């Protein structure tokens, strides 16, 4: 089984915000791959689909960004997921909006959702798909920037950039190595 978790904040007021890039990515995956069921458990919405004869959980934590690790830990523990079978999708303020990058390991780089996951899993050793949301303008505070809404042009660019790389899920479910994914899609 593979698990792909997109980070974001719940609620209408957070839709289309930079911090919800992970939720936007999960929505794009749900549009492409039919899901057989959805349930709310482990502080998350969990969508189940089959890709390449592999069960895949597409997940949106309902804990708000700063507590994402709680939901991730509950899912990992319940389903006994190997961390090599997990990808966390999140926004990255250090990447341009059209940039999507795979990463393994490393610090949170100030991202509170990733920090929560590291604290709850007690490791930095998990795969990430970073979605660029543009650098914080000098006159903005970081929190205000990541909670600001994308312009229509930015949102379309973000979605198209993700769609251009959406086939990563086929390689991931075919058990390609993460180094292969980084070399092919970064």
Swiss-Prot record:
GO terms for biological process: protein quality control for misfolded or incompletely synthesized proteins; rescue of stalled ribosome. Gene3D superfamilies: Peptidyl-tRNA hydrolase. Its EC number is 3.1.1.29. The keyword Coiled coil does not apply. CDD domains: PTH. It is found in: Cytoplasm. It catalyses: an N-acyl-L-alpha-aminoacyl-tRNA + H2O = an N-acyl-L-amino acid + a tRNA + H(+). GO terms for cellular component: cytoplasm. Belongs to the PTH family. NCBIfam families: pth (TIGR00447). This is Peptidyl-tRNA hydrolase. It comes from Mycoplasma mycoides subsp. mycoides SC (strain CCUG 32753 / NCTC 10114 / PG1).
């Amino acid at each position: 089984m593979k698990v792909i978790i997109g980070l974001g904040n719940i609620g209408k007021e957070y839709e289309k915000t930079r911090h919800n890039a992970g939720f936007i990515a999960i929505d794009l995956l749900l549009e492409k791959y039919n899901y057989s069921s959805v349930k709310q458990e482990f502080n998350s919405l969990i969508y189940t689909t089959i890709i390449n004869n592999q069960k895949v959980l597409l997940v949106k934590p309902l804990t708000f960004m700063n507590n994402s690790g709680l939901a991730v830990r509950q899912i990992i523990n319940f389903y006994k997921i190997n961390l090599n079978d997990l990808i966390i999708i999140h926004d990255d303020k250090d990447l341009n909006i059209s940039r999507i990058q795979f990463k393994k390991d490393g610090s949170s780089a100030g991202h509170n959702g990733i920090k929560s996951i590291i604290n709850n899993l007690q490791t930095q050793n998990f795969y990430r798909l970073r979605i660029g949301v543009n650098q914080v303008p000098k006159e903005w505070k970081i929190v205000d920037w990541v909670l600001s809404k994308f312009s229509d042009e930015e949102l379309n660019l973000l979605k198209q950039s993700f769609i251009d790389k959406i086939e990563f899920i086929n390689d991931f479910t075919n058990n390609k190595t993460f180094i292969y994914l980084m070399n092919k899609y970064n």
